[in-house]
Amino acid sequence: MTLTMSTVVFFSLILLTLGLQPKDKDEGVMGRSRLGKRGLLMRSLDEELKSNDCPEYCPHGNECCEHHECRYDPWSRELKCLDSR
């Protein structure tokens, strides 16, 4: 089977797209994917919400809900709104 360059590019894009899909944890709304600096996959964190409509992440100094504070999570390496109680 002979593959043309456009076919190779097409399948490469499909594989790349499938590899960049965010994993659905327990959040209600998944954010969009985008390729960030250093080629790392990042979610549109300002749009991703927990099931109680509070943001899970707090990039760019966004406010967290009541009884939550913005802290660095070493496991995910992201700023998250974590329960302060």
Curated annotation (Swiss-Prot):
The presence of a 'disulfide through disulfide knot' structurally defines this protein as a knottin. The cysteine framework is VI/VII (C-C-CC-C-C). GO terms for molecular function: toxin activity. This is Augerpeptide-s6a. The keyword Zinc does not apply. It comes from Terebra subulata. Residues 1-20 form the signal peptide. The keyword Disulfide bond applies. GO terms for cellular component: extracellular region. Keywords: Cleavage on pair of basic residues, Disulfide bond, Knottin, Secreted, Signal, Toxin. Residues 21-43 form a propeptide. Disulfide bonds join 54-65, 58-70, 64-81. It is found in: Secreted. Expressed by the venom duct.
